[in-house]
UniProtKB/Swiss-Prot annotation:
Assembly notes: UreD, UreF and UreG form a complex that acts as a GTP-hydrolysis-dependent molecular chaperone, activating the urease apoprotein by helping to assemble the nickel containing metallocenter of UreC. The UreE protein probably delivers the nickel.
Keyword Cytoplasm listed: yes
Name the UniProt record assigns to this protein: Urease accessory protein UreD
Lineage: superkingdom: Bacteria
Lineage: Bacteria, Bacillati, Cyanobacteriota, Cyanophyceae, Synechococcales
Subcellular localization: Cytoplasm
Described purpose of this protein according to its UniProt entry: Required for maturation of urease via the functional incorporation of the urease nickel metallocenter.
GO MF assignments: nickel cation binding
Gene expressing this chain: ureD
Recorded family membership: Belongs to the UreD family.
Alphabetically ordered keywords of this record: Chaperone, Cytoplasm, Nickel insertion
One of the record's GO cellular component terms: cytoplasm
Amino acid sequence: MQRLDPWHGRCDLQFHATNGSTKHQGGCTAPFKLLRSERGEDGRCELPVLHTAGGLVGGDQLSLDFKLEANSRGLITSVAAQKVYGSIGRSRLQPEGCFAHQQVRCSLASGSDLEWLPQELVLYADALFEQQLTVTLPQDASFLSAEIVRLGRTAAGETLQQGRWRSSLTIQRLAGESSTWELADRVELGGASLESPHGLGGAPVFGTLVWAAPMAMGAETTASVLEGARADREGLTGTMRCGALNQGLIARYSGESSRDARFWFSRIWERTRTIRGLTRPRIPRVWPLQEQPLRRQTSTVNAFEAAAETH
């Protein structure tokens, strides 16, 4: 039986600021494809990335490398949910299965601002997936990411079964020749941890938002941001917790609804813009049109309405 080589897709992008707006250059290889970028109200380059293969199988690799020059601003998202198909027991050559891998590297220069907001990751039964997100940035740069994973196709009555999901997230602050860790986070979900009360407790959805702020916020500002993020949980289901980093915050979601995770993270995303005096975020055009996570209930700042009823 002939063994096919795994697919390795690459996406290398550079962002540079000019005349108050940010432009990108670079390119990608199959299965990646770049769609038309848009200019945000703050001059930010908003760029959707399409994965044309329709999903990942064991052995596939994705490598994304983003470099932001001084004072540039970017928002990168995916066009659709990423699917990872089952691997265990699918091959006579490797009945134990093989991990698919994704590695994202982000390098930010002084005064730059990157928002990495991919759509949901869906692991099918017996899927094996490992992801790495590595960020380096100076003290005055901003990085925000929000990633959500669904472990099993819940609507079809499916669980992850023997599958596993691994995640490594590291954020390193650079100051001349020295550096400090803003965050070093490693998570592995599979087996007993899916049902354990010390793991997901049977919840199929897990998400993490992290923001490395471009300024020292101080105790009072940090407490205010966290209080607001906790208030943003109103009307949403699931377990939602948040806490402070040295210079930023981290938020976790676990529950039944990827929509509620997305709504909560979107509201925190808006807060990270507001605290810096930036324009309200604009929901990317490739996100589900029926959802309006930032719609306000009243004119009161940071009061929101979850418009969609489906999960």
